[in-house]
Swiss-Prot record:
Signal peptide: 1-18
Quaternary state and interactors: Tetramer of two alpha and two beta chains; disulfide-linked. The hemoglobin/haptoglobin complex is composed of a haptoglobin dimer bound to two hemoglobin alpha-beta dimers. Interacts with CD163. Interacts with ERGIC3.
Free-text note regarding domains: The beta chain mediates most of the interactions with both subunits of hemoglobin, while the alpha chain forms the homodimeric interface.
Gene Ontology CC entries for this record: blood microparticle; extracellular space
Record function comment: As a result of hemolysis, hemoglobin is found to accumulate in the kidney and is secreted in the urine. Haptoglobin captures, and combines with free plasma hemoglobin to allow hepatic recycling of heme iron and to prevent kidney damage. Haptoglobin also acts as an antioxidant, has antibacterial activity and plays a role in modulating many aspects of the acute phase response. Hemoglobin/haptoglobin complexes are rapidly cleared by the macrophage CD163 scavenger receptor expressed on the surface of liver Kupfer cells through an endocytic lysosomal degradation pathway.
Glycosylated residue positions: N125, N151, N183, N232
Species of the source: Sus scrofa (Pig)
Keywords: Acute phase, Antibiotic, Antimicrobial, Antioxidant, Disulfide bond, Glycoprotein, Hemoglobin-binding, Immunity, Secreted, Serine protease homolog, Signal, Sushi
Protein name: Haptoglobin
Presence of keyword Glycoprotein: yes
Subcellular compartments: Secreted
Main localization (coarse): secreted
PANTHER family according to UniProt: COMPLEMENT COMPONENT 1, S SUBCOMPONENT-RELATED, HAPTOGLOBIN-RELATED PROTEIN
């Protein structure tokens, strides 16, 4: 518990209790904290304030200040005897992307700028991406989860075949995978870990958006472990800046027409992406950089300057453009937000 951001109580003076074992008040008065002098017509009130460790924040309502009542119970004005809880901070990388230097050849070196980025390895040793959205859950694509499996393979049989890494090659165990109920048209799935991961400089979830950031021309950042220009899987996490594209132009590019009877059966790269109301497209960067095989499951991360927070606007679904096609395709996170929240709450 301590490693995962356990609550820390600071004694102002007087008495303190063991925060991790309950709400029993224990006399801790000694010479290091002498009893304060009394004043006429006044009284002394014992108070503690709870804080969370670095990379965690108080989730419970109230200000974290507790006073000792006449029954020797610590209580908060808002929450009563209920102890506060700490949750992981999201979308606040210690080394944000604008502090990272571009390296030769247009490749981008991400030194902890994308702590939500995870690497997933299939049982056929194929690399794909996943995105940490809280201490125990990740988003990825349904296609990633099914890599090397038949379409009718059950989720419970898929989970044990996957290897997942966060931070600096820290392997984490998967408890279960859950597919979106309409995963043939919504290419998304959730991964639940057996244990919560400790959040730190290298491991931090990205925030889920409460509003839609997908506007044509908006630039997002996509990191990944996918194939490089030589079509080899990279050993170093890279990222690229990509603009949101016009959806109608993207549909016309891959399908030939927005009129169903005029659609062509084949896209310019030989594989047809899923394009519907749950998706959006992003084009090439101004340096003609792009995502490629193995990057799917990574977030289209946008930085909201108003609250200095990073949000996952999309999850890369179609990663086969590799600079040979004009657009990558992403699942729009706001369109699946209710499903994400309900699924996590139910599991």
């Amino acid at each position: 518990m301590r490693a995962l951001g356990a609550v820390v109580a600071l004694l102002l003076c007087g008495q303190l209790f063991a925060a991790e074992t309950g709400n029993e008040a224990t006399d801790a008065t000694d010479d290091s904290c002498p009893k304060p002098p009394e004043i006429p017509k006044g009284y002394v009130e014992h108070m503690v304030r709870y804080h969370c460790q670095t990379y965690y924040k108080l989730r419970t309502a109230g200000d974290g200040v507790y006073t000792l009542d006449s029954n020797k119970q610590w209580t908060n004005k808002v929450t009563g005897e209920k102890l506060p809880e700490c949750e992981a901070v999201c979308g606040k990388p210690k080394n944000p992307v604008d502090q990272v230097q571009r390296i030769m050849g247009g490749s981008l070196d991400a030194k902890g700028s994308f702590p939500w980025q995870a690497k997933m390895i299939s049982h056929h040793n194929l690399t794909s991406g996943a995105t940490l959205i809280n201490e125990q859950w990740l988003l990825t694509t349904a296609k990633n989860l099914r890599l090397g499996h038949k379409n009718d393979t059950k989720a419970k049989d898929i989970a044990p075949t996957l290897r997942l890494y966060v931070g600096k090659k820290q392997e984490v165990e998967i408890e279960k995978v859950i597919f979106h109920p309409d995963n043939s048209t919504v290419d998304i799935g959730l991964i639940k870990l057996k244990q919560k991961v400790p959040v730190n400089e290298r491991v931090m979830p990205i925030c889920l958006p409460s509003k839609d950031y997908v506007n044509v021309g908006l630039v997002g950042y996509v990191s990944g472990w996918g194939r490089n220009a030589n079509l080899n899987f990279t050993e170093h996490l890279k990222y690229v800046m990509l603009p949101v594209a016009d959806q109608e132009k993207c549909v016309q590019y891959y399908e030939g027409s927005t009129v169903p009877e005029k659609k062509t059966p084949k896209s310019p790269v030989g594989v047809q992406p899923i394009l519907n109301e749950h998706t959006f497209c992003a084009g090439l960067s101004k340096y003609q950089e792009d995502t490629c095989y193995g990057d799917a499951g990574s977030a289209f991360a946008v930085h909201d300057k108003d609250d200095d927070t990073w949000y996952a606007a999309g999850i890369l679904s179609f990663d086969k453009s590799c600079r040979t096609a004009e657009y990558g395709v992403y699942v729009r996170v706001t369109s699946i937000l209710d499903w994400i929240q309900t699924t996590i709450a139910d599991n």
